[in-house]
């Protein structure tokens, strides 16, 4: 995985040039055919999902993103009667990689997830280079077969970084005010370092000298960062934001690189889409990034909302009209049977294993260290299928001595 440096905003040569590079040795017909999704299974419907992931989506939702590649999880969430192919295109801008390089340092949970996200991305690219696309990256023992989701994960190239920032301002549809941000917070946590209130009885000079000597220490840096998260409402930064809530907010400088990439993919790349659901959308867990991206007309969603788009074809960005006739009574709370809120997960699609209950007398004299661990044998846990309940609900009966779990990643559990 390579990190591409940020290009200058004053790069007029790139600005006036074509954003696509073509290989002179490759015919134009082959390039056009390669850009089109291949019809792997003729006769099946196809649906394209295009998402842009920033670092917060990986750091705070790495478990969810891994499930997108787990075939057992996909089988349980996608309607088995829907005969369709899903082309999931995941775009990782260079902004995400640079933020990984900053977040991955340390021993915090965010740093651990950032390193895990980098390893996960590397694993996917390694399997593509080795020609192992047929297997499940989350379950190497799975057998190749007809898949419901076809993946295309790629990293931003230098010619895809987007136009200059002065040109990006032409796409701005709204100038957000400070009061539109959650908790009036318009800056990232790293920009708020050192802005906690000065303790009583301590001068400004001594306080600043204390910060300068301790910020060289990584542990002191993290401690002050955590202190700002806890006492942000008592900080001078919060008081200034509260007093100027009606003023226009100022965008964090480094966020421009993400906005430029999103503008290029959504407005400049000029790809034809069959529906608004297929347009490029930014997946982020950061509320500050979401406000600024929406101000440029870029649809945003979190990781859970992205799962609704992938598995249920439900876009959270679609506007829903308010019906004034509703009185919020019990009758109004009922939803249509095909509503997204009525969908359930068929857990019987997960693999079952038999519950072994060894007797105490049998293993009483055995040494625990010499006991061999055997892999549990998979069984059919469904006893009867096709039953209906009193309300006409579909019911499946399971064996009492069988158990199944949601799919998890393979590997050994780390122990301190």
UniProtKB/Swiss-Prot annotation:
Pfam families named among the record's database cross-references: PIN_4
Gene this chain is encoded by: NMD4
Organism superkingdom: Eukaryota
Protein name: Nonsense-mediated decay protein 4
Stretches with biased composition (Basic residues): 360-375
Upper classification of the organism: Eukaryota, Fungi, Dikarya, Ascomycota, Saccharomycotina
Cellular component per GO, a single term: cytoplasm
BP GO annotations: nuclear-transcribed mRNA catabolic process, nonsense-mediated decay
Region (Disordered): 1-21, 195-218, 356-393
InterPro entries per the UniProt record, alphabetical: PIN_dom
Function, in words: Involved in nonsense-mediated decay of mRNAs containing premature stop codons.
Sorted UniProt keywords: Cytoplasm, Nonsense-mediated mRNA decay
Intracellular or extracellular location(s): Cytoplasm
Positions with biased composition (Basic and acidic residues): 12-21
Keyword Repeat: no
Principal location: cytoplasm
């Amino acid at each position: 995985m390579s990190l591409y440096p940020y290009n200058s905003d004053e790069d007029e040569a790139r600005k006036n040039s074509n954003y696509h590079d073509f290989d002179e040795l490759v015919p134009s017909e082959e390039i056009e055919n390669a850009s089109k999704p291949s019809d792997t299974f003729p006769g099946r419907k196809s649906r394209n999902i295009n998402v842009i992931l920033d670092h917060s989506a990986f750091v705070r939702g790495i478990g969810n993103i891994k499930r997108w590649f787990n075939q057992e999880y996909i089988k349980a969430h996608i309607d088995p009667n829907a005969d369709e192919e899903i082309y999931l295109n995941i775009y990782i801008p260079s902004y995400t990689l640079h933020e990984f390089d900053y977040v991955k340092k340390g021993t915090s949970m965010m740093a651990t997830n950032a390193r895990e996200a980098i390893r996960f991305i590397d694993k996917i690219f390694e399997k593509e280079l080795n020609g192992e696309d047929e297997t499940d990256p989350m379950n190497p023992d799975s057998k190749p077969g007809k898949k419901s989701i076809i993946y295309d994960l790629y990293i931003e190239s230098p010619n895809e970084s987007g136009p200059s920032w002065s040109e990006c301002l032409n796409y701005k549809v709204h100038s957000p005010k400070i009061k539109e941000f959650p908790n009036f917070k318009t800056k990232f946590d790293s920009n708020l370092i050192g802005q906690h209130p000065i303790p009583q009885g301590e001068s400004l000079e001594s306080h600043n000298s204390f910060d300068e000597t301790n910020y060289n220490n990584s542990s002191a840096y993290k401690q002050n960062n955590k202190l700002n998260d806890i006492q942000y409402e008592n900080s001078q930064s919060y008081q200034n934001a509260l007093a100027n809530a009606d003023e226009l907010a100022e965008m964090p400088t480094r966020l421009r690189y993400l906005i430029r990439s999103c503008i290029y993919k959504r407005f400049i790349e000029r790809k034809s889409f069959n529906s608004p659901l297929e347009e490029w959308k930014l997946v982020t867990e950061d509320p500050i990034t979401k406000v600024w991206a929406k101000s440029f007309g870029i649809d945003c969603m979190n990781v859970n909302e992205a799962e609704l788009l992938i598995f249920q074809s439900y876009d959270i960005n679609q506007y829903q009209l308010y019906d004034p006739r509703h009185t919020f009574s019990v009758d109004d709370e009922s939803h249509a049977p095909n509503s997204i809120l009525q969908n359930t997960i068929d857990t019987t699609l997960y693999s079952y294993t038999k519950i072994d209950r060894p007797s105490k007398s049998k293993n009483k004299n055995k040494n625990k260290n010499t006991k061999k661990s055997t892999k549990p044998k998979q069984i059919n846990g469904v006893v009867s299928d096709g039953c209906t309940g009193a309300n006409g609900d579909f019911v499946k009966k399971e064996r009492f001595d069988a158990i199944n779990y949601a799919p998890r990643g393979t590997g050994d559990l780390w122990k301190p």
